[in-house]
């Protein structure tokens, strides 16, 4: 409170509508009469495959930690510039972790607030229907084409040499995809069975989170016609590699 009063805060910028990011914005806005800026259009930002899965009423799980009632005062668009007293911030739409995820680039400083799309301590959770591997790869490529060289993430320490770090995250996801494919080439598995093999000897919460990432990869591979699903698309059903 003392910091906000001293610095005369004028904008509340929210990276995405997860419960560990957006709820405090409502309280701060009320207590200090500061407007909230965010993407705010989660349903519209979902990828076409995720919209299709949701419209099919399939049991795909997900929605972990979603702040479903979050609404900003102002809705932001990709590449929009927000101007303050002595600063300007570019909005960078980066879906993948969550469809409404934004990064904020401080133009004068070449610094990017990267939210959860790039965290300082591990790769991010991608949990369908709001997490999407295809969108995630596109967002990483988008960041690689930018000039921001320092990231301030929502979790973890400041990221120096940001492009190198983002390239490392992309490489990790490609390696994970190859792991999944190598398992499916042996025989069909569901997402939980694959996660058990990849994250073996890890605590159960880690394996479950890993299974959501695996399921996101499976949906992406399915969309690309690399694999097929036995029955309806679900983390419980088996996926099989397609020999071409």
Each language-model region and where it sits:
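C-terminal regulatory/interaction regions
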Residues: 182-244
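Aromatic/hydrophobic pocket-lining residues that form the small-molecule binding cavity
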Residues: 22, 136, 140, 214
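Glycine-rich phosphate-binding loop signature in dinucleotide/nucleotide-binding domains
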Residues: 3-7, 83-87, 107, 145-146, ...
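Histidine-centered divalent metal-coordination motifs
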Residues: 15-21, 97, 155, 217
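Short hydrophobic/aromatic-enriched beta-strand-loop microsegments
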Residues: 33-39, 113-115, 206
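Metallo-beta-lactamase
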Residues: 53-55, 88-179
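Active-site HxH/HxHxD metal-binding segment of metal-dependent hydrolases
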Residues: 2-83
């Amino acid at each position: 409170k003392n910091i906000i009063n001293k610095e005369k805060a004028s904008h509340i910028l929210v990276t995405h509508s997860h419960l560990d990011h957006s709820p405090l914005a409502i309280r701060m806005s009320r207590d200090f009469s500061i407007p909230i800026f965010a993407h705010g259009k989660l349903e519209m930002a979902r990828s076409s495959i995720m919209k299709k899965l949701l419209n099919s009423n399939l049991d795909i799980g997900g929605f972990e930690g979603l702040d479903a009632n979050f609404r900003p005062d102002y809705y932001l668009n990709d590449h929009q510039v927000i101007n303050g007293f002595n600063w300007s911030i570019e909005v960078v739409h980066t879906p993948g972790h969550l469809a409404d995820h934004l990064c904020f680039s401080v133009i004068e400083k070449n610094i990017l607030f990267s939210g959860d799309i790039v965290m300082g301590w591990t790769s991010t959770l991608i949990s369908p229907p709001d997490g999407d591997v295809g969108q995630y790869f596109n967002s990483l490529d988008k960041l690689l084409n930018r000039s921001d060289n320092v990231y301030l993430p929502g979790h973890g320490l400041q990221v120096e040499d940001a492009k190198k770090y983002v390239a490392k995250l992309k490489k990790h996801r490609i390696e994970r995809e190859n792991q999944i494919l190598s398992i499916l080439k042996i025989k069909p598995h569901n997402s939980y069975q694959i996660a058990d093999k990849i994250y073996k000897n890890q605590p159960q919460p880690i394996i479950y989170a890993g299974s959501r990432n695996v399921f996101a990869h499976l949906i992406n591979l399915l969309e690309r016609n690399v694999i097929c699903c036995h029955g309806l698309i679900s983390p419980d059903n088996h996926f099989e590699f397609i020999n071409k």
